[in-house]
């Protein structure tokens, strides 16, 4: 996990174009022309032995002839030159290079030699096969993107050159901008995880849009994605939804806190919402319009997007009735077909003091008494009253001047209520997902070290003896050490006769499968809600705690059919077993659930040797130690999420001077989200 030298890539001071050319249709000519047209803020040094000058600029014959190291080098030469060029750039002190080429094969021996030439100099490589990197704030359009884009607050990260070109072109045509945009190419060195890690703390980036088809380094990617999604919205589009592993990707995205979108249209809509509008601080909405038909259409769109219309308190109803006596109060708020532009402003003012009314959505079709341009002017004047954010939809569109004025004042604009509602729903999904992942879980039952050691010894002994599968009494013995109630008899997989109906028996299947991209993944398969439906499986990545296990179960038909608590206990115990016994690479068992307990029936454990196999590093039990201190026996261990209450008590007992020395400033207290950041750490990157 490293962001080393990525600042040179995204905040370049100078650039060298290796292979700059005037030859029509050559990569070097396209890149040279694009960099020149963009007007990069720093020096541009072309390198090509075939030219003495290009467009009035002196040309260097060789990369080694450069008088100083460029921040970034754009390599546009044939592949057989890459190793030599990278070596020379590295010796100069160049910190980043982008290989702009037609091929994105990162597995070839040639690319291995390129990385070997770069490694001694800590030179970062983007590509091969990258379209380029764009940072509009410094007019850096490095590569061959077809469109020039403005500066904005959203970053675009993609594995596809074609989609990058399309999105940049779409944004440029609509006057939208980016903080950064990068097409990763073959990801031989710099990959999606590295870029997410950098953008997570980039002050110019308010949100991240990610397009990918495959994750190449799951552990690094998950760590970076979780860190980024805690700081700002990360929305992801994965192409290839027909891929059998797509459901696993969905589980990984949810676990990291990213929000998945279904189409490129959805992703493009978020460029408007996140790049222009103030990110809504509410999960509910108030609709303001002048027409009942428009109100009904908008309300239907919000219902279809599973977005909640706010329930107004009596005080809000009274305030609106006082300010707008002729309006049809309630949500949606219908001002009437004779409404004037100022009535929209009065509505915003009346709603402003009442947090329960949520984010304001103005949906309007132009009328004689309220032309769109005049309503937009009022929204701009009164946008200071939209404390919880404001978005707008004007049927029929607006002229460029009005659109630009709305955006300049932080009011995002969408063409239809449907797109407006879906864009807001994704922000709500992000907020709710982040809140879920930051919940403080209940403490897990303490695992006895002796039991863990016995389970590990059992698995090691079986592998040494040539066994790759444990079942029956052997599997039951290993798992029972983690507090699971286990029946080793596979024949008992059918529900036992003679049990009372009030025990409400339900059987679910729990499988641990080894995914090629994400390693071990739990598959939870519940019986269908009716006989006409097929069994439905949901997935989750270990390690699991009760909160994360609950999220898995809530997405299955089981959540509405049987007691949940026994299943959560069983899933978290199975997760502990998988995390503590690294030899477990697969598992299949039936989980029989009654009202009071869940029993594991007929488990089968697949064994193997796969170190570092989990995509998310579990609690590092091996770092626990004990020591004697002033006559007491103390346990020193890594912090856990369930330590939040104790950590809060610890901070509350500190003196003001202790707080100032520990947190480098005056501190009055910490809320849940701040405490969660201290206790819910990433063990891979923070320990």
Residues covered by each model-derived region:
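Residues that cap or delimit alpha-helices
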Residues: 78, 655-656, 671
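A short beta-loop-alpha structural element at the N-terminal edge
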Residues: 634-646
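A short, aromatic/hydrophobic, helix- or strand-capping loop or linear motif
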Residues: 658-666
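Catalytic strand-loop segment that frames the active site of acyl-thioester-processing enzymes
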Residues: 650-658
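Short acidic N-proximal helix/loop "leader" segments that mark the beginning
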Residues: 456, 467-468, 611-629
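Divalent-metal-activated hydrolytic enzyme cores
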Residues: 594, 598-621
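A short helix-loop-beta-strand connector motif used in the catalytic cores of GNAT acetyltransferases and
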Residues: 668-669, 673-687
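Catalytic-core regions of core metabolic enzymes
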Residues: 1-602
């Amino acid at each position: 996990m490293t962001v080393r030298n990525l600042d040179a890539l995204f905040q370049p001071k100078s650039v060298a174009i290796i292979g700059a050319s005037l030859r029509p249709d050559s990569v070097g000519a396209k890149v040279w022309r694009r960099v020149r047209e963009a007007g990069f803020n720093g020096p541009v040094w072309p390198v090509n032995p075939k030219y003495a000058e290009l467009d009035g600029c002196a040309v260097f014959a060789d990369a080694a002839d450069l008088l100083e190291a460029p921040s970034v080098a754009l390599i546009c030469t044939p592949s057989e030159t890459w190793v030599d060029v990278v070596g020379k750039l590295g010796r100069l002190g160049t910190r980043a290079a982008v290989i702009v080429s037609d091929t994105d094969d990162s597995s070839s021996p040639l690319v291995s030699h390129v990385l070997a030439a770069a490694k001694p100099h800590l030179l970062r490589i983007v590509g091969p096969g990258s379209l380029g990197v764009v940072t509009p704030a410094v007019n850096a359009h490095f590569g061959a993107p077809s469109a020039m884009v403005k500066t904005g607050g959203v970053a675009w990260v993609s594995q596809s050159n074609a989609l990058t070109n399309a999105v940049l072109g779409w944004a440029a045509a609509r006057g939208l901008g980016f903080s950064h945009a990068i097409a990763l190419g073959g990801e031989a060195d710099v990959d999606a995880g590295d870029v997410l890690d950098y953008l997570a703390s980039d002050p110019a980036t308010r949100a991240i849009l990610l397009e990918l088809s495959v994750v190449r380094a799951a552990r690094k990617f998950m760590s970076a994605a979780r860190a980024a999604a805690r700081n700002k919205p990360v929305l992801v589009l994965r192409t290839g939804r027909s891929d059998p592993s797509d459901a696993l990707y969905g589980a990984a995205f949810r676990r990291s806190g990213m929000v998945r979108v279904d189409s490129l249209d959805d992703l493009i809509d978020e460029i408007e919402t996140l790049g222009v509008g103030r990110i809504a601080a509410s999960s509910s909405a108030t609709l303001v319009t002048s027409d009942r038909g428009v109100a009904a259409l908008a309300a239907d769109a919000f219902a279809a997007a599973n977005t909640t219309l706010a329930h107004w308190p009596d005080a809000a109803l009274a305030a609106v009735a006082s300010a707008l006596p002729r309006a049809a109060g309630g949500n949606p708020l219908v001002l009437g077909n004779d409404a004037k532009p100022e009535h929209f402003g009065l509505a915003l003012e009346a709603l402003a003091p009442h947090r329960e009314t949520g984010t304001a959505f103005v949906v309007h079709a132009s009328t004689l008494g309220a032309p769109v341009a005049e309503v937009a002017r009022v929204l701009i004047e009164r946008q200071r009253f939209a404390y919880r954010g404001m978005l707008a939809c004007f049927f029929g569109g607006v002229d460029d001047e009005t659109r630009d004025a709305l955006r300049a004042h932080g009011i995002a604009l969408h063409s239809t209520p449907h797109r407006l509602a879906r864009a807001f729903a994704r922000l709500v999904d992000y907020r709710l997902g982040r809140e879920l992942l930051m919940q403080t879980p209940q403490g897990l039952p303490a695992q006895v070290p002796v039991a863990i050691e016995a389970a590990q010894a059992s698995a090691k002994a079986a592998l040494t003896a040539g066994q790759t599968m444990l079942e029956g009494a052997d599997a039951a013995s290993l798992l029972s050490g983690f507090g699971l109630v286990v029946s080793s008899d596979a024949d008992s997989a059918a529900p036992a006769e003679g049990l009372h109906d009030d025990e409400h028996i339900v059987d679910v299947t729990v499988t641990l499968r080894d995914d090629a991209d994400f390693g071990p993944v739990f598959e939870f398969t519940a019986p269908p809600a009716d006989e006409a439906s097929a069994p439905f499986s949901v997935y989750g990545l270990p390690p699991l705690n009760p909160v994360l296990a609950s999220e898995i179960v809530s997405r299955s038909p089981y959540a509405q059919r049987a007691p949940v608590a026994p299943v959560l206990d069983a899933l978290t115990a199975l997760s502990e077993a998988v995390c503590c016994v690294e030899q477990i690479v697969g598992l299949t068992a039936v989980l029989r659930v009654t009202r009071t307990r869940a029993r594991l029936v007929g488990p089968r454990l697949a064994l193997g040797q796969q170190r570092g196999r989990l995509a998310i590093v579990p609690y590092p039990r091996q770092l626990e130690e004990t020591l004697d201190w002033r006559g007491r026996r103390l346990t020193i261990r890594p912090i856990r999420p369930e330590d939040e209450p104790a950590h809060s008590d610890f901070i509350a007992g500190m003196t003001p001077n202790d707080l100032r020395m520990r947190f480098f400033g005056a501190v009055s207290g910490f809320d849940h989200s701040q405490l969660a950041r201290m206790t819910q750490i990433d063990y891979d990157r923070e320990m």
